[in-house]
Amino acid sequence: MALLEIIHYPSKILRTISKEVVSFDSKLHQQLDDMHETMIASEGIGLAAIQVGLPLRMLIINLPQEDGVQHKEDCLEIINPKWIETKGSMMYKEGCLSVPGFYEEVERFEKVKIEYQNRFAEVKILEASELLAVAIQHEIDHLNGVLFVDKLSILKRKKFEKELKELQKKQKRE
C-alpha cells in the first residue's frame, strides 16, 4: 500500500467531473486500499478518488466507532453512486482534507438513499442519515467537481477566501 498525495484547494483538478468506473480489477482494489491508508493517515472520515488525482467515480467513507477507532472492515467503498432518494434538510459543520483547517456549516439532506457498486462490481443499496448521510453527500459532490465551500453563503465564502489568503501568506513565511 502507498500513501497518496491529497490535492488541495484551489487546484483545478478538484473541479474535474469524475468518470464511471468500468474495470473492477486488482488495480482498482489497490487504489481503494491506497485511498483508505491515505485517508486514515490524514485523519479523515471520507475521501473521493479525485482528491488523490484519480478522476473516477469512487469514494470511501470510514466513520469511527464509539471507541473512536476507524476499523478497515467498516469502510464503505462506494463506486458509481446514483441517487435514489433524498429527504429533509439539516445544517452540519463540515471540513475537508482538500481544504485543511477550515470548517463551516453547510445545508445537507437529512436522509439519503443511494445505489452503488462495491469493489467486486456488486450492486448495493444504502440508506443513511446523520453523519453518514452528510459524508456521502460531501464525497459525491467531489465526484461532480463541487466542494463544500461552494455551498457557503456569499458572506461565509468571503470569510473563507480571506482565511485562505492569510494561511497562504503564513505558509510562505515559514
Swiss-Prot record:
One Gene Ontology MF term: peptide deformylase activity
EC numbers, comma separated: 3.5.1.88
InterPro entries, A to Z: Peptide_deformylase (IPR023635), Peptide_deformylase_sf (IPR036821)
Give the source's domain of life in one word.
Answer: Bacteria
Top enzyme class of this protein?
Answer: hydrolase
Q: Where is the active site?
A: E139
Q: Return the Pfam families for the record.
A: Pep_deformylase (PF01327)
What keywords does the record list, in alphabetical order? Hydrolase, Iron, Metal-binding, Protein biosynthesis
Please give the catalytic activity noted in the UniProt record: N-terminal N-formyl-L-methionyl-[peptide] + H2O = N-terminal L-methionyl-[peptide] + formate
Chain residues that bind Fe cation: C96, H138, H142
Describe how the cofactor binds: Binds 1 Fe(2+) ion.
Q: Which cofactor does it need?
A: Fe(2+)
Q: Give the GO biological process terms.
A: co-translational protein modification; translation
Described by its record, this protein's role is as follows: Removes the formyl group from the N-terminal Met of newly synthesized proteins. Requires at least a dipeptide for an efficient rate of reaction. N-terminal L-methionine is a prerequisite for activity but the enzyme has broad specificity at other positions.
Q: Which PANTHER family match?
A: PEPTIDE DEFORMYLASE
Q: Which family does it belong to?
A: Belongs to the polypeptide deformylase family.
Task: Specify the protein name.
Answer: Peptide deformylase
Q: Which gene encodes it?
A: def
